[in-house]
């Protein structure tokens, strides 16, 4: 018999997104971070092999607003250099994602119409994939350029609930170890999946939330801790009888911020199979 409790811990089952472009309107910081690495994406794109078509993917794209200007500029650069190859862009996220706003954005029906590259440029095709990025999403050897920003800190499932906080940064040692192990497995799966998808000479550029050498992370860079504030308010709801103990615990974020060592671990000798000779390296 299936474990009903375990099912509720699966990220694809429990996460949802508010619509109408809510995400992009409230994540200017993510857009600023994405815009800052435009040059890296340009170099990656201009180094791609001369395939018949170019297939790009934006993994964990949300409503597409934070990366829209980046993709617009990349396509504009290609076209300005006389590269008129067909371009497919696959946006991936959970099935509950705000794909409606995403498709409207790219056609100029919503948001920044001057960046609606699907309408502005010829021979550009936009698709969506409503499956999480912890598994292979595209046919092997078909992806020219993969990109992901501020998304892959999400784990595929919560290995446990956190009893006295809302986020792993405030969890006890046992809970942290379980999340760390889950995140390690997920990170290897992510890299192996992208390696299978990439065509020869393909590139994958990924920008993630993490914990730096000083222990800083999103919402904890000096002053108040964002997640401690979240927990304080959520705990107050429990103390006041507004929510139950179960509801408090179930609010555990399905996230883990990796350290540099955790990001680099799959590339160590002990996990060298990440880069199989028959597959392109990530």
Where are these regions (language model features)?
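N-terminal charged/capping segments associated with class I S-adenosyl-L-methionine
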Residues: 1-139, 154-171, 206-214
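A conserved beta-strand element that flanks and buttresses the S-adenosyl-L-methionine
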Residues: 147
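Short catalytic micro-motifs in class I SAM-dependent methyltransferases
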Residues: 150-151
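A short glycine-rich, Lys/Arg-flanked "PGG" loop and its adjoining helix->strand segment in the class I
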Residues: 166-174, 182-200
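Short glycine-centered segments of the SAM/dcSAM-binding site in methyltransferase folds
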Residues: 203
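Conserved Class I S-adenosyl-L-methionine
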Residues: 218-245
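Short alpha-helix
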Residues: 256-270
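Single conserved hydrophobic/aromatic residue that forms the stacking wall/gate
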Residues: 272-282
